[in-house]
Structures are given as C-alpha cells and as structure tokens.
Curated annotation (Swiss-Prot):
Lineage, opening ranks: Bacteria, Pseudomonadati, Pseudomonadota, Alphaproteobacteria, Hyphomicrobiales
Protein name (Swiss-Prot/TrEMBL): UDP-N-acetylmuramoylalanine--D-glutamate ligase
A GO CC term attached to the entry: cytoplasm
UniProt keyword annotation of Hydrolase present: no
EC class name: ligase
Family: Belongs to the MurCDEF family.
HAMAP family assigned to the protein according to its UniProt record, in alphabetical order: MurD
Length: 467
C-alpha cells in the first residue's frame, strides 16, 4: 500500500466504494488523513464499514471542513450530468480528484524521479501496459503495474527512486488527475467511445491529451486525425514527442513494416527488431502496441536488445488473442474480450484460415462489418442468441453450423480443423458479442473456452493461466 501522506491531518470525502474505492480510503487513513466515505450501493457501504472505514451520507456532511473529494472513476464528473457529490463539492469550493492523482502527489513528494509510464488510448492500452511492465521486469527493473488494469494504484508499493511504475489510465481517471506528469506518456489512438460520459469527441480527445501534455516524453500514435493534432500541438509548444505509426514511414519516430519495427531520426531509419514468431504479439494491432511499449522502455533507459528479449517472453493477456493450446497443426485462441464486431476484426485479420466460434448477446450492426474477413473463415460455429442473425449474415459466404454452446463448438471445430489439409489452422473464439446471454462476463466465457480446449484428448497447453 502507498500511504497518502500528502493528506495527513486533512479530512477527505470519498464517493464510490466499489473497485479501487476501499483501497483509496485505506491509503488516506494510513497516511494520517480522515475519511468520510459513501456509495449509493448499501452493500458497498457495509463492506467499507467492515474494513474499518468511516462512512456517512455525504449529503449530510459539513463541507466547510472537507479538503478534497476523492471520486471513483465510474462516477460522472460532467456528463450526462455531474453526480450530486460533485455538485456539493463544487458548491463548497472543494477540489475533486481521483486515485491516480493521489498517487501522482505521493510520487512527487517522496520520489519525484521514479520512472512513471502512463498509457491511454481508446484501444490497446491494456496490452501495451502489460507488455511495457513485462519488458521492464524482464530487464531486471523493480516494476509495479496497476491503475485501470490489475491492482488499484494505491495498493502498489510506495514510490522510491529506482522503482518503475506502469499505469493504464482510462479517460475517467485522467479527468480526475490534473497534475499527472509521467516520465513517458503514451497515447495510442482516439476513436469515438464513452461519449455518454464526455459529451463530445472534442472533449474526449482533450481529456486524453492531458496525459501526454504533462509528460517528459509524449509517445503518440499518429494514425488517426485526433492524435495527429495532439502531436502537432505539443511539438509546436516545444515538447518532446515520439510519433508511432503503422501506416507509413516517419522521418522521426517509430514505425512498423509488417512485423519489422523501425526507429527513425536524423534523416535515417534503423531496424529495431522483428515481431516474427512472437505469438502473443501477432496481428497488425499488436505492432502498434509493441511500438509504443518499445518507445516507452527506451525512454526509461532500456536497450533495444533488452526490449526484444522481453517481447519474446511476453505471455499476452488473458482473453485477448490468448493462445490456449495446440493439437497437431491446430492452434486454439481465446479472444473472448472481443465483445463487438470491431473488436473481433484484429483477430480475424491475423490468421489466414479460421474455424470461428462466434455469437452471444448481439450488438447493434451484428457482424456485417466483418464480411471482408469471411474468405478467411473455413467454417463458423455459432452460439447464443445471435446465432440465427449471424447465420443470416454469413449466408452462403462460408460454411457454418449453429452449435449452441461453446463446449459443442470447440468439439466440432477441433474435429473439423484436424481434418483440414491446408496446414496450420486456428480455432478462434472471437464472439463479436456480449456474453450475458450465457455467461456472467467475457472472462467466464473465456474460461469456458479454455475448459473445453483442455478437455480435448492430446491437447498441448500453451503457458499458464493468466489474469
């Protein structure tokens, strides 16, 4: 735990006791501050009480004595309208921050030069965060990873000079972190998302920009118009910017040509290394993740050789193109995190011949946008409520069956793929659907796929179960 010593002797209101809320309250208390915590969910309040946290309805609090409101990232700050606790704090002139800002202040107080990599983007930030942390650890660096992935930030070990921190930051967390100042800030991409919470694309992009605007080195993917504009603004302001791109060569920055990564500068481009043969980084989208992680690790002082070694041992993230096992020439891949068609596209574009398990609770638009990948699909195995609609979309473009369940789909796909004379093929769970018709969440769905694969006679499992 990181004691929040910067709030010693101060009274803090905290709203939001799910997720990181309890850890944040405990950090305030450990640092000598006083917390009054609340949540609209009575069960969360009861859990906090059981942890020894003082609770009370913030509507009844004396806001004249409160120094700060700590807000959970899931609580609306502005859109669609401010939460009532936000309105109370603003009326009283009380600052409103989140747990990432709490960490930033502790780092500034106790180890201002402890390397901090903060990563955001609409897509790819979890993989980039995990990859960056893995490479740093593999190179022998004392490394802590958390934020919007894994551990709540205040449960990490306290800042010391040589301890590296790698934090995934959502737009909600950035919005509550006014003084975020990473050693390396990474902005991967900006596409429409969370507009119900941020109002407009311009506001959403402006929030994302804050992370890199405060960075010593701003690492920015420039393959979309919003990020290009951010990079241009920061460069004009004299900030250090490392551009990354998948769509073409750069005069200064990092780019990819297929699986080969390059670093460009001073009028020349030099190869860094290749991603060829690294199964956990397969696919064009992972080339961007790898470029960003490489740039961040270089900013932290690693050599290209150390980065390449770390890449080659990266196990990947669970449920994101996760290689589960192999049976002869058939690879089994769990991409359960793909809960809509856009999220399935990277996996479908990464393999030449696919036995595709898809379906679940359908999203608007179905799989019509994936038609360009149908020639890659040897056969589709459709599950859940979406099966009839997906069958209608596929039509005669490729073979399909309505399997109903993941267990049946894995058995049938394994049988059919084993008989495929084409050579290496993949059985891919990439549902393009939510999971809630058959499973509690996409993680449970992914576990069901893993279990079905493990049950196949002769299967050679790949790696260990990852969180």
């Amino acid at each position: 735990m990181i004691p929040a010593t910067t709030f010693h002797g101060r009274q803090v209101a905290l709203f939001g006791l799910g997720g990181s809320g309890i850890a944040t309250a405990q950090a305030i208390m450990a640092g000598g501050g006083e917390v009054l915590a609340w949540d609209d969910n009575p069960e969360s309040v009861a859990k906090a009480k059981a942890e020894g946290i003082k609770t009370g309805d913030l509507r009844d609090a004396d806001w004249r004595s409160i120094h700060t409101l700590l807000l959970a990232p899931g609580v609306p700050l502005t859109h669609p309208h401010p939460h009532w606790s936000v309105e109370l704090a603003r009326s009283a002139g009380v600052e409103i921050i989140g747990d990432i800002e709490l960490f930033v202040r502790e780092r500034r107080m106790h180890a201002a030069h402890a390397p901090l990599v903060a990563i955001t983007g609409t897509n790819g930030k979890s993989t980039t965060t995990a990859l960056t942390a893995h490479v740093l650890k593999a190179a022998g660096r004392d490394t802590q990873m958390g934020g919007n992935i894994g551990r709540a930030v205040m449960t990490l070990d306290p800042p010391v000079a040589d301890r590296h921190y790698v934090l995934e930051c959502s737009s909600y967390q950035i919005d509550l972190s006014p003084t975020l100042n990473p050693t390396a800030g990474v902005l991967l991409n900006i596409t429409p998302d969370h507009l119900d919470r941020h109002g407009t694309m311009e506001n959403y992009a402006a929030i994302k920009e804050r992370l890199v605007a405060g960075s010593d080195t701003a690492i920015i993917g420039v393959d979309d118009e919003y990020c290009r504009a951010v990079a241009d603004r920061l460069e004009k302001a004299g900030r250090k910017v490392s551009r990354i791109s998948l769509t073409g060569t750069l005069e200064d920055g990092f780019f990819a040509d297929g699986t080969q990564l390059f670093r460009a500068g001073q009028g020349k481009a030099e190869p860094l290394f290749s991603l060829e043969g690294i199964g956990s980084l397969r696919g064009r989208h992972n080339a961007q993740n790898a470029l960003a992680a490489a740039a961040a690790c270089l900013a932290c002082g690693l050599s290209p050789a150390e980065i390449q070694t770390g890449f080659r041992s990266f196990p990947g993230l669970a449920h994101r193109m996760e290689q589960v096992g192999k049976l002869g020439h058939v690879l089994f891949v769990n991409d359960s995190k793909a809960t809509n068609a856009d999220a399935s596209a990277p996996a479908l574009s990464s393999f030449p011949r696919i036995y595709w398990i898809a379906g679940g609770l359908p999203k608007a638009g179905g799989i019509a946008s994936l038609r360009q990948y149908f020639p890659r699909i040897a056969k589709a195995y459709l599950i859940g409520e979406a099966a009839p609609a997906f069958a209608a979309t596929i039509g005669e473009a490729t073979n399909y069956e309505i399997s109903g369940t993941i267990a049946a789909a894995v058995q049938h796909a394994a049988r059919d793929a084993a008989d495929d004379p084409a050579g290496d093929v993949v059985v891919l769970l990439s549902p393009a659907c939510a999971s809630f018709d058959q499973f509690r969440n996409f993680e449970v769905r992914g576990e069901a796929f893993r279990d079905a694969v493990r049950a196949l006679p002769g299967i050679e499992l790949i790696g260990e179960k990852r969180a």
